[in-house]
Amino acid sequence: MTPSPHDLLHCGMNSQDRDETNGDRQRLVRVALGQEDGDLLVRGAQVVQPVTREVYAADVLVAGGRVAAVGPDLPARARRTVQARGAYLAPGFIDGHIHIESSLLTPASFAAAVLPHGTTAVVAEPHEIVNVLGPAGLNWMLGAGRTSGLRVYASAPSCVPASEFEQGGARVDAAQVAEMLARPGVLGLAEMMNYPGVLGGDAGVWDILNAGRRSGKRLDGHAAGLGGRELLAYAAAGLHSDHEATTPEEARERLRAGLWLMVREGSAARNLAALLPVLRDLPRRALLVSDDVSVDELLELGHLDRLLRTCVAGGLHPADAVALVTSQPAEYWGLHDLGVIAPGYHADFVLLRDLQHFGVLETFVGGEEARPGGETPPLPGGGVDLGPGWDGATFDPPAHWPTLQMFPDQIVTGRAAPGSGDARLVVADRYGRGEWSSCWTLGSGLRGGTLGISILHDAHQVALLGGSDADLRAAGRALERLGGGIVLVVDGEVREQLPLPYAGLMTDHAPAEAAAALGRVTAAARLLGCMPAGRL
């Protein structure tokens, strides 16, 4: 049986090209010549062309999931016609760097959240799940993307664990990275966070870089805080991009060094407003990415469409803004048949009300109305195992240990005098080693009860913040039963919970259900005096 475009859309450019036959392309040519009817005809659109930076009136004819012809008043017929009535037709939006796990959603649920906002493809950086499960996590992410309705590509995580001080569920070496890079749909090496290892000549890091170079694919960068000679040396190592610039000066320095500029705007870091002046002047070797974005923000604010609104409000020409999420991420990642509405390209496009608010009327993937996929495939392993000694555990830290000082709305911490804390923080190994450590904290505001979570970047151990040993133990066991997630325990009872049974990081529930559960846990924690920020 010949696969449909929806069956193939997950596979990536190389897999789709292998599955395509001469007959498919010959039919596309016949449709383009008017010798055969197409499958879809979009009449009367204002087509956004990011390559030439223009908007022009045209019809778009589609056959076999690809664009056959684009032009004004096409003398063409198709099995189905959509009347655009002057609405704008832009290429489908591409998020060039995102950790899907940070949304708390599986790929299918994530697709349900972003397809209505015009996103048709993402390049997932799955180092969260790979820290839990190793390369099997990347395999699962790609497999789960196959039926999601979204084109899910990936990059191969380069830093698992993120540092030598972390102990997670996996250690990934250069040979495993090379295997991941060889898989269809893997577009390059994921962000090389270990820049000290790059600059210091660490043998393991350079073996991984060499695996990336041998693959002939992209080497994604992560150069937080680097400048001057160090940034030049990092670029000289062969990295191609960076998404850590926070100031216009840093952004320009990266562009001068030959790096592609990924401008990050998500839930954890928001750099777009600061970098808009650079995008206005130098919009060509740049792309917009979300990096980490939470489910509640996806539902409330949107995805790449909200970044486009910010760009246009900040003075970018709409075609320049659209290029940042279409042709330019496609060019960077080598997705040569995405990002433009042109003959031979995949028929991924978005019908928009206007080019100021970017309200989405309809999203098309492979020439069909986008529809989120079906069931999420099972994921063996990746749960929580605190070990048999947990039930008798006590969590008082040594008296001379310093207290961890927390600050409202900050991710930085400080030190306070020993014995000055108001709640204990326990970090417990979730991978069956039966280990844990604890310290006192000051500034959490928590009055009674315990918060527990299995999301702890990047090793994703279990973190518990609370008072009594009994509640700390109960919260840990609750996370075990759920297979991971977020819980709030008071007097030994679970008051609120968000199960995340996929690697302790994701749920396959509908986005609205996941956001509601997250909201209930957060609200309950605030009632107990704790003021969790973001995703707790």
UniProtKB/Swiss-Prot annotation:
Enzyme superclass (EC): hydrolase
SUPFAM superfamilies: Composite domain of metallo-dependent hydrolases (SSF51338), Metallo-dependent hydrolases (SSF51556)
Cofactor: Mn(2+)
Positions of region (Disordered): 1-24
Biological process terms in GO annotation: adenine catabolic process
Signal peptide feature range: none
Enzyme Commission numbers on file: 3.5.4.2
Keywords, ordered alphabetically: Hydrolase, Manganese
Reactions accelerated catalytically: adenine + H2O + H(+) = hypoxanthine + NH4(+)
Molecular function terms from GO: adenine deaminase activity
PANTHER family hit by this protein: ADENINE DEAMINASE (PTHR11113:SF2), N-ACETYLGLUCOSAMINE-6-PHOSPHATE DEACETYLASE (PTHR11113)
Protein family according to the UniProt entry: Belongs to the metallo-dependent hydrolases superfamily. Adenine deaminase family.
Name this protein carries in UniProt: Adenine deaminase
Lineage start: Bacteria, Thermotogati, Deinococcota, Deinococci, Deinococcales
Gene this chain is encoded by: ade
